[in-house]
């Protein structure tokens, strides 16, 4: 293979992934104390450092430029691939107790301590369903107070079309130029510093934090450099050991509806999941949660709040919001909007912008600016309606049981009286896809029957390539190429639907879109769901068509 500059990113990606595989499969790395007592192991990694330096791949990206595309390529090299994820799962160890210690160390290496992040006046939000929507609502409300809060940061995940969506200021993704600038400032600081291998055996020279951890560090750096006056942070997974939990003094914490998800990492009961979510609670920072939480989960959340010496308050749905058209559709969003009202109220009161906090009562009076903020909230891929040509697309990236029921119910109620043809476009590559389809089917039936059902992969283009921002290494490439999940979904659908709908399989989202355009001369209602990756890929395909 010719090793030119263009091959460096691929070279370093391959090297790091194989190195990670060694680490993940080596028992001693799960136990730092064994590292200290094993001279051979330590010598091995000193030698690896030597190879890093000798091969000049410690930071080859300095040699190929620092554009946005370079940043995305480098960022994608930090993803855990499917084999590594499976290796971790096989160990049965859910907890990486080093996560937060490592986050503190990574932060030190880029020039910050956790206390530096306190100046961001953070709202910290966790939950299973609706935490992204709640974060968006909260950010939009705060954005109505521009004179007092000229810059509001928003950190969410995952993204739909562009990784820049994860780091927003005043509701807008940061520019490609700023993303690249701040990305390489963090990247280069990590390259120019080292950590003690006695304390942090995983942090060998040349290594970087994983994809989400790196973005979390990048968000802190960006928001501080941009002088954001308040920031809204959505937890990645769980709370207790999430990399965002390096936040020491949030102003307020929120918990959206709990459900069963990410069971490998969080546990497979509501109690275990609630315990993890409650890990973001901090002394002195009041916590709020939506009403109608599962009773067992609510009990644990209350215990966690008491543990952390703070208060937990259930937020009712405000009556004043009953007739408000929220910027994010779906009746279930009313509870998320109500939670956002209380979170924003705490920030604004603490900042001496609101004289009095909003009362946590269903009859409370909500300021007009709050209402405008809720109405103006924009959040693609969640109960989104798009008219494209003759067809109407109903798009929601639901990928858990509860969110699938909510999204399917929204679609059913919205198109119940429509006489158009009905088409389903679905994929879920890493969870129990058939179970989600069953949830969908039972939620729309018998009122809605689909004429055509299309199961696709999350591959963006019919050439077999992905949009660079949508590259994902955490699914089995073999399963994608052989359409294993999609063929299984067809069998399951035909069984539950008694072969009424015509089923199709496509190898890419672009092909699925082309198929839909040719199915009928008459208009159709198209429900797209199952995966945020699917939704993001479809929106990217739409963008290219619109440009043409």
From Swiss-Prot:
GO BP annotations listed: one-carbon metabolic process
Enzyme Commission number: 6.3.2.17
Listed pathway(s): Cofactor biosynthesis; tetrahydrofolylpolyglutamate biosynthesis
Binding-site list for Mg(2+) 2: 262
Residues where Mg(2+) 1 binds: 157, 234
Record localization: Mitochondrion inner membrane; Mitochondrion matrix; Cytoplasm
Cellular component, GO annotation: cytosol; mitochondrial inner membrane; mitochondrial matrix
Domain of life: Eukaryota
Record keywords: ATP-binding, Cytoplasm, Ligase, Magnesium, Membrane, Metal-binding, Mitochondrion, Mitochondrion inner membrane, Nucleotide-binding, One-carbon metabolism
Cofactor: a monovalent cation
Coiled coil residues, start to end: none
Enzyme class: ligase
Catalyzed reactions: (6S)-5,6,7,8-tetrahydrofolyl-(gamma-L-Glu)(n) + L-glutamate + ATP = (6S)-5,6,7,8-tetrahydrofolyl-(gamma-L-Glu)(n+1) + ADP + phosphate + H(+)
Ranges annotated as spanning the membrane: none
Gene Ontology MF annotations: ATP binding; metal ion binding; tetrahydrofolylpolyglutamate synthase activity
Record text on cofactor binding: A monovalent cation.
Reported function: Catalyzes conversion of folates to polyglutamate derivatives allowing concentration of folate compounds in the cell and the intracellular retention of these cofactors, which are important substrates for most of the folate-dependent enzymes that are involved in one-carbon transfer reactions involved in purine, pyrimidine and amino acid synthesis. Required for methionine synthesis and maintenance of intact mitochondrial DNA. Involved in telomere maintenance.
Family of this protein: Belongs to the folylpolyglutamate synthase family.
Designated name of the protein: Folylpolyglutamate synthase
Lineage: Eukaryota, Fungi, Dikarya, Ascomycota, Saccharomycotina
Gene name linked to the record: MET7
């Amino acid at each position: 293979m010719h090793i030119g500059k263009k091959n460096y990113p691929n070279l370093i990606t391959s090297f790091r992934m194989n190195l990670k595989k060694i680490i993940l499969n080596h028992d001693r790395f799960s136990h730092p104390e064994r590292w200290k007592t094993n001279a051979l192991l330590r010598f091995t990694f000193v030698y690896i450092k030597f190879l890093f330096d000798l091969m000049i791949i410690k930071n080859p990206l300095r040699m190929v430029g620092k554009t946005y595309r370079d940043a995305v390529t480098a960022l994608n090299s930090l993803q855990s691939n499917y084999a590594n994820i499976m290796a971790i799962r096989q160990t049965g160890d859910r907890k990486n107790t080093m996560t937060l210690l490592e986050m503190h160390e990574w932060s030190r290496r880029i020039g910050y301590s956790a206390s530096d992040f306190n100046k961001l006046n953070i709202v910290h939000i966790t939950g299973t369903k609706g935490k992204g929507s709640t974060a968006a609502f909260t950010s939009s409300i705060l954005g109505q107070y521009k004179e007092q809060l000229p810059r509001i940061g928003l950190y969410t995940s995952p993204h739909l079309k562009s990784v820049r969506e994860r780091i927003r200021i005043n509701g807008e993704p940061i520019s490609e130029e700023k993303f690249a600038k701040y990305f390489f400032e963090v990247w280069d600081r990590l390259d120019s510093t080292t950590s003690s291998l006695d304390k942090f055996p995983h942090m060998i020279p040349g290594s970087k934090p994983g994809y989400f951890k790196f973005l979390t560090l990048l968000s802190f750096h960006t928001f501080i450099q941009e002088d954001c006056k308040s920031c809204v942070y959505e937890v990645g997974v769980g709370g207790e050991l999430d990399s965002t939990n390096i936040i020491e003094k949030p102003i307020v914490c929120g918990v959206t509806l709990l459900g069963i998800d990410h069971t490998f990492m969080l546990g497979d009961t509501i109690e275990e999941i609630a315990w993890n979510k409650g890990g973001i609670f901090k002394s002195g920072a009041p916590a709020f949660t939506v009403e109608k939480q599962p009773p067992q989960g609510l009990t644990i959340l209350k215990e966690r709040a008491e543990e952390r010496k703070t208060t937990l308050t259930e937020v009712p749905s405000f009556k004043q919001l009953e007739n408000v058209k929220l910027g994010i559709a779906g009746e279930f969003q009313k509870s998320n909007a109500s939670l956002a009202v209380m979170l924003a109220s705490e920030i604004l009161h603490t900042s001496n912008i609101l004289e009095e906090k909003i009362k946590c009562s269903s009859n409370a009076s909500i300021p007009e600016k709050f209402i405008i903020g809720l109405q103006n909230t924009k959040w693609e891929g969640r109960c989104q309606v798009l008219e494209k040509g003759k067809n109407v697309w109903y798009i929601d990236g639901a990928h858990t049981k509860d969110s699938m029921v909510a999204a399917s119910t929204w679609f059913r109620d919205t198109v119940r009286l429509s006489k158009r043809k009905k088409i389903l476009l679905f994929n879920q590559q890493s969870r129990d896809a058939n179970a989600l389809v069953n949830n969908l089917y039972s939620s729309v039936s018998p009122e809605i029957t689909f004429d055509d059902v299309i199961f696709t992969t999350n591959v963006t283009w019919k050439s077999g390539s992905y949009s660079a921002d949508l590259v994902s290494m955490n699914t089995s490439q073999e399963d994608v190429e052989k359409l294993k999940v999609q063929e299984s979904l067809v069998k399951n659908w035909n069984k539950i639907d008694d072969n009424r709908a015509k089923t199709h399989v496509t190898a890419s989202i672009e092909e699925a879109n082309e198929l839909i355009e040719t199915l009928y001369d008459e208009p159709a209602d198209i429900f797209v769901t199952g995966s945020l990756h699917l939704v993001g890929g479809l929106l990217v395909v739409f963008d290219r068509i619109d440009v043409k």
